């Protein structure tokens, strides 16, 4: 069962519809009780780093989420801001992230992206998988394209945690992984068959 954490941010319906079309069992969890039987977890998110963490805390699901991911090693993939809150800190906010993949979230201008490039980085972009993704990008090694909408990127403390890169003025990590925790900066639920393949791969990890 794929469980999508519904804490008030993200395209929950889009994930559910995509999994339904693939005949993969999926549900939304709005409470800790609904999260309890999760075998795979999708942690979506849009908006701001601090706001996402505040809503996750307010949902009452964070303690059980930590228990399942950190203690029980249940696979989880964070999407967009759901990926960013996997980090320790963000230049966008003051709060402490989940810290599941050590690193910091930086603004694109921090890596000297030319001012001629508009922000947010919005639209389709090529993605280059790297070793270590443990199958998340299976079948997507060539010609993978995903939909992005963001102004911040994930800077891993350990470069080995990067499992895919994209380029927007300069290369940046668009997917990360450590153990049973993955994060993708792009939106697989908006990325048509590329996104469907990635979400199916996650269901089969």
Walk through the language-model features, giving the residues of each.
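Acyltransferase
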Residues: 184-205
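N-terminal beta1-alpha1 ligand-phosphate binding loop
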Residues: 2-24, 188-189
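Pocket-forming structural segment of enzyme catalytic cores
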Residues: 89-168
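Beta-strand-turn-beta hairpins that frame and shape the catalytic cleft
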Residues: 143, 177-181
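Short, surface-exposed beta-strand/loop micro-motifs that present aromatic residues
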Residues: 170-177
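Cysteine-nucleophile active-site neighborhood
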Residues: 47-122
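An anion/phosphate-binding loop that grips the pyrophosphate of nucleotide cofactors and donors
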Residues: 38
